[in-house]
From Swiss-Prot:
Protein name: DNA replication and repair protein RecF
HAMAP family noted in UniProt: RecF
Database matches in InterPro entries: DNA-binding_RecF (IPR001238), DNA-binding_RecF_CS (IPR018078), P-loop_NTPase (IPR027417), RecF/RecN/SMC_N (IPR003395), RecF_2 (IPR042174)
Primary location class: cytoplasm
PROSITE patterns given in the database record: RECF_1 (PS00617), RECF_2 (PS00618)
Recorded GO CC terms: cytoplasm
Species: Coxiella burnetii (strain RSA 493 / Nine Mile phase I)
Alphabetically ordered keywords of this record: ATP-binding, Cytoplasm, DNA damage, DNA repair, DNA replication, DNA-binding, Nucleotide-binding, SOS response
GO biological process: DNA replication; DNA synthesis involved in DNA repair; double-strand break repair; SOS response
C-alpha cells in the first residue's frame, strides 16, 4: 500500500509553511471555512496530476505576495520511501522531481501516486457532461492496462489532426488520411474500456449496496458511436456533418458511463446527498478494482465528508474506507462529526497553519 510519510507545502494558497507527518491510514483535517483544509488535499492532488481540482488558473495557487509554491512528499512504495516534489513559479515554469531526478512527464508522478479524489462537488459526477465520466474510466485503465496510455496519446494526436483538417475544410483525402489510425486506436481504446467496465460493475454494485440498498442502479457504457456500425463506417456516414461542424462527432472521445434506475437517469431520482454517496461508491469500487488488478490501493482525498450526510452514512463511509486499507486524507469543520478509527491522526487547520493533535 503506497502512503505519504511526510508532506511539506510552501506558499500554496494560504499555506505558507506546512510540515506534517501524516498517519499511514486515517488523517482528518478540521477547522473553519477558509482555514486551508481543502488546500492540503489540493496540494497532494496537484503533485499527482499537475493540476488543481478547484481552479483552471494555476497562478491562483501561488500565495499572495510570493512568486512560487513548493510541494514535497516522501512516498512509501512498499519497499522504501522516495522523494517526490514540484515547484511552480509565477511565470508558469514548473519542475517535477521524482527520486532526485527531473521527470519528463507528469504521468510518472500519477503512476507512483495513485489518487482517488472526492471533492465537495462530487455529486456533479452524475450531473456534468460525459467528459468527467470518461476520465473516471480512463483513470482505471491508466493504472491497470499497460498499453492504455500510448493508445490514448496516439488517439489524441490523430483526432487533433483530423479536427484541424475538418475545421480548415481541407480536401477529403487529407481529412480521411487520419481515419485509419483513429479507427485502429479508437477500437482498441473502446475494448479496453469495455473490459474495465465489465470488471468494475459488480464491485460498484457491492459498494452501492452498503450505501443505498433501496436504489439498485445500473451502469451503462456507451462507446461513442452507434452499435449498428463499425467506427470506420460511422466516420464515413458522418463525414458531411463533420465538415459542416468542424470536428469529429463520433468516436471514443464521445464515450460515456451513465447510471439509471429503471428507465430514469439516476440524477433525476436521487437527492444531492444520495448522489454524493453514489459517487463515493463509484470511487471505492474504483480503488477495489485497482487493488485486485495490481495489489496497489490508491490514496483517498475526501473533502468535506460530513456535508449532506447523516451520522449513519458518515460512519458507513468511514467503515468502508477502513476496509479498503488505503491512506485517507479527510477534511471537515467539526472533528466530532466523524467517528475516526484508532489508527488516525487529527490535524487542526487555522489561518493556513496545520498542527497535529
Amino acid at each position: 500500500m503506497p502512503y505519504i510519510g511526510s508532506l511539506k507545502v510552501n506558499q500554496f494558497r494560504n499555506l505558507a509553511d506546512v510540515d506534517i507527518t501524516p498517519h499511514s491510514q486515517f488523517n482528518f483535517f478540521f477547522g473553519q471555512n477558509g482555514a486551508g483544509k481543502t488546500s492540503i488535499l489540493e496540494s497532494i492532488y496537484y503533485l499527482s496530476v499537475g493540476r488543481s481540482f478547484r481552479t483552471h488558473l494555476p497562478q491562483r495557487l501561488i500565495q499572495d505576495n510570493t512568486d512560487r509554491f513548493l510541494i514535497f512528499i516522501t512516498l512509501y512504495n512498499g519497499t522504501q520511501f522516495i522523494p517526490l516534489g514540484v515547484e511552480r513559479d509565477c511565470h508558469g515554469d514548473r519542475c517535477l522531481r521524482i527520486n532526485g531526478e527531473t521527470a519528463s512527464s507528469w504521468s510518472l508522478a500519477a503512476k507512483r501516486l495513485p489518487l482517488c479524489s472526492l471533492s465537495a462537488m462530487s455529486h456533479r459526477f452524475l450531473l456534468d457532461g460525459p467528459r468527467v465520466r470518461r476520465q473516471f474510466l480512463d483513470w482505471l485503465m491508466f493504472h491497470v492496462e499497460p498499453s492504455f496510455f500510448s493508445i490514448w496519446q496516439r488517439l489524441q494526436r490523430s483526432l487533433k489532426q483530423r479536427n484541424a483538417a475538418l475545421k480548415a475544410k481541407l480536401p477529403l483525402g487529407e481529412i480521411t488520411h487520419w481515419d485509419k489510425m483513429l479507427v485502429e486506436d479508437g477500437e482498441r481504446l473502446h475494448q479496453l474500456r469495455q473490459n474495465v467496465v465489465t470488471e468494475f460493475k459488480p464491485l460498484f454494485t457491492q459498494m452501492l449496496q452498503q450505501f443505498l440498498p433501496a436504489y439498485p442502479l445500473i451502469g451503462h457504457y456507451f462507446r461513442g458511436w452507434s452499435e449498428k456500425y463499425s467506427l470506420m463506417e460511422q466516420l464515413q456516414i458522418n463525414l458531411k456533418q463533420d465538415l459542416q461542424r468542424g470536428y469529429t462527432q463520433a468516436g471514443p472521445q464521445r464515450a460515456d458511463f451513465r447510471l439509471t434506475l429503471g428507465d430514469l437517469p439516476a440524477q433525476d431520482i436521487l437527492s444531492q446527498g444520495q448522489q454524493k454517496l453514489v459517487t463515493y461508491a463509484l470511487h471505492f469500487a474504483q480503488g477495489l478494482l485497482l487493488k485486485e488488478k495490481t495489489g496497489i490501493s490508491p490514496i483517498y482525498l475526501i473533502d468535506d465528508l460530513p456535508a449532506e450526510l447523516d451520522a449513519n452514512k458518515r460512519d458507513c463511509v468511514i467503515d468502508l474506507v477502513n476496509c479498503l486499507e488505503s491512506q485517507v486524507f479527510i477534511s471537515g469543520i467539526d472533528p466530532n462529526e466523524i467517528r475516526l478509527p484508532p489508527h488516525s491522526t487529527l490535524f487542526h487547520v487555522k489561518h493556513g497553519k496545520v498542527a497535529a493533535l
